[in-house]
């Protein structure tokens, strides 16, 4: 077995998180070598947007050729997002879910255990979950996700009705 294959086998599977009609796919970072496999996984989950919260390390041309938008919202590993990243995250969700309510938004950091799950947890909290339930939902599918510093941030986070269903349509959302 090659080293590359062993490393690939150790990677956690993408975690699909669904709540109130919104879908998020938490993944680890692809590479230029694994990008085609990554695109297949994204297509399988109806992803039209990838939010990259780590430093760029792969070429996004192939994703964009496939109609998948890449948005960079990098912030420091092991920490929680600054307010500007939080605001931009909710703008991305608003734009994408208004354009295509059935679509899934993928979000990744390096391992898919810290920064990416924190952004998804923020969305779940805005959709009405308590922080404990949001973290539990993510950890059920992404074991080891969210460190103590990030957990403390989520505990203190106050939802601001940024994601709210409109017209009773379960898949529509708006950012306020």
Curated annotation (Swiss-Prot):
User: Which of UniProt's keywords are assigned here?
Assistant: Cell membrane, Cell projection, Cytoplasm, Hydrolase, Lipoprotein, Membrane, Methylation, Prenylation, Protein phosphatase
Protein localization: Cytoplasm; Cell membrane; Apicolateral cell membrane; Cell projection, Axon
Q: Which InterPro entries match?
A: Prot-tyrosine_phosphatase-like, PTP, Tyr_Pase_dom, TYR_PHOSPHATASE_DUAL_dom
GO cellular component term of the entry, any: apicolateral plasma membrane
Per its record, how is this protein called by name?
Answer: PRL-1 phosphatase
The tissues where this chain's protein is expressed are given as:
Expressed in the adult head (at protein level). Expressed in neurons in the antennal lobe and V-glomeruli (at protein level). Expressed in dorsocentral neurons (at protein level).
* Pfam families listed in its UniProt record: Tc-R-P
Q: Which residues form the Tyrosine-protein phosphatase domain?
A: 13-166
Which GO molecular function terms does the record list?
protein tyrosine phosphatase activity; protein tyrosine/serine/threonine phosphatase activity
Briefly explain the null phenotype: Viable. Results in delayed hatching, locomotor defects and inability to fly. Results in defects in axonal target areas in several central nervous system circuits. Results in axonal and synapses defects in two distinct brain neuropils in the antennal lobes and mushroom bodies, respectively related to olfaction and olfaction-associated learning. Reduces size of the central nervous system neuropil (a region of densely packed axons, dendrites, and synapses).
Q: Which family does it belong to?
A: Belongs to the protein-tyrosine phosphatase family.
Q: Does the keyword Translocase apply?
A: no
PROSITE patterns attached to this UniProt entry = TYR_PHOSPHATASE_2 (PS50056), TYR_PHOSPHATASE_DUAL (PS50054)
**Propeptide residue range(s):** 174-176
The catalytic site is made up of 109 (phosphocysteine intermediate)
| An individual GO BP term | cellular response to carbon dioxide
Q: Which reaction does it catalyse?
A: O-phospho-L-tyrosyl-[protein] + H2O = L-tyrosyl-[protein] + phosphate
Originating species: Drosophila melanogaster (Fruit fly)
| Top EC class of this enzyme | hydrolase
What Enzyme Commission number does this protein have? 3.1.3.48
Quaternary assembly: Homotrimer. Interacts with uex, possibly at the plasma membrane.
């Amino acid at each position: 077995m090659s080293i590359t294959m062993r490393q690939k086998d150790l990677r956690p599977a993408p975690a699909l998180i669904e709540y109130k009609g919104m879908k998020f796919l938490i993944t680890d970072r692809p590479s230029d070598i694994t990008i085609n496999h990554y695109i297949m996984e994204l297509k399988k989950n109806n992803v039209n947007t990838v939010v990259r919260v780590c430093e760029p390390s792969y070429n996004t041309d192939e994703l964009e050729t496939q109609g998948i938008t890449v948005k960079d919202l990098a912030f420091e590993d092991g920490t929680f997002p600054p307010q500007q990243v939080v605001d931009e995250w909710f703008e991305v969700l608003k734009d994408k879910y208004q354009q295509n309510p059935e679509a899934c938004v993928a979000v990744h950091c390096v391992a898919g255990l810290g920064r990416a799950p924190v952004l998804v947890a923020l969305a779940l909290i805005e959709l009405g979950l308590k922080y404990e339930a949001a973290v539990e939902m993510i950890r059920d599918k992404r074991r080891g996700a969210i460190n103590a510093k990030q957990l403390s941030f989520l505990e203190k986070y106050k939802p601001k009705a940024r994601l709210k269903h409109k017209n009773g349509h379960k898949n529509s959302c708006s950012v306020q």
